[in-house]
A protein has these predicted regions:
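Alpha-helical transmembrane signal-anchor/signal-peptide segments
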Residues: 22-32
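C-terminal motif of bacterial Sec signal peptides marking the signal peptidase cleavage site
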Residues: 12-15
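Bacterial signal peptide processing site
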Residues: 17-20
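HKD-type phospholipase D/PLD-like phosphodiesterase module
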Residues: 32-70, 80-221
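Positively charged n-region of N-terminal signal peptides that target proteins for export
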Residues: 1-4
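Sec-dependent N-terminal signal peptides
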Residues: 6-8
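Active-site microenvironments that recognize anionic phosphate/pyrophosphate groups
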Residues: 74
């Protein structure tokens, strides 16, 4: 009975107000920059090429190499980002890229972005890093269930999530597939790991992926 009353109270409170939209100027991917780092992979089929990233640790290595190769821009989109070994490594390399002048755009769904508001605020201070949270919850909480309950008054938002996972470097190469940014997606968790695949993509498909990223980046959610 007590739990029922708590839920009812949360629904009543959250129904009193709506999430206020923030008007942001549209932004778009930059033109493809020179990327000699990938010449060996594009030689056979320069217009488009694919490389399967089946092994988790190798996929992480390719991801870090791609970030380190960036000279102009990185656009990263993910559903889940844990700041464990994997997530911290990716973030460290992204910050280093931004430090050398690369424009970094980060788009993360808000479902599991728990307890990281201070980190996001710190990233906001970097002149070359811009992040956006897709469909952010109005009422912040560090627990998944607590956040769901506190936002029951906006039920139409709860399951409107972004599951895309992509990283586009210099609008020349991209990594796209099923891996979120967490140890269990790269074979580094000591208890259990997911089995996922990705593609390292070059050529004309990258521009299509950039268009998709821009659509989500500029979306009102």
């Amino acid at each position: 009975m007590r739990n029922y009353l708590l839920v009812l109270f949360a629904m009543t409170v959250t129904a009193c107000s709506a999430l206020q939209p923030v008007e942001l100027e549209p932004e778009y991917a930059r033109q493809a920059a020179a990327a000699p780092h990938w010449d060996n992979l594009r030689q056979a089929t320069p217009d488009r090429w694919l490389y399967l990233l089946n092994d988790g640790p190798a996929a992480l290595d390719w991801r870090l190499r791609a970030i380190d190769s960036a000279t102009d821009s990185i656009d990263l989109q993910t559903f889940l980002w844990h700041f464990d070994t994997t997530g911290s490594l990716v973030l460290d390399h992204l910050v280093r890229a931004a430090d050398r002048g690369v424009r970094v755009r980060i788009l993360v769904d808000d479902t599991f972005l728990l307890g990281e508001d201070n980190l996001l605020e710190a990233l906001h201070e970097h002149g070359n890093i811009e992040y956006r949270v897709f469909n952010p919850y109005k009422r912040r909480a560090n627990g998944f269930l607590a956040r769901q309950i506190l936002n029951l008054g906006e039920f139409h938002r709860l399951d409107h999530r972004m599951h895309n996972k992509s990283m586009i470097v210099d609008n020349q190469v991209a990594i796209v597939g099923g891996r979120n940014l967490a140890d269990e997606y790269f074979g580094l968790d000591h208890q259990a790991n997911f089995r996922d695949m990705e593609l390292l993509v070059g050529g004309t498909p990258v521009q299509e992926l950039s268009t998709i990223f821009d659509d989500y980046w500029n979306d009102h959610w």
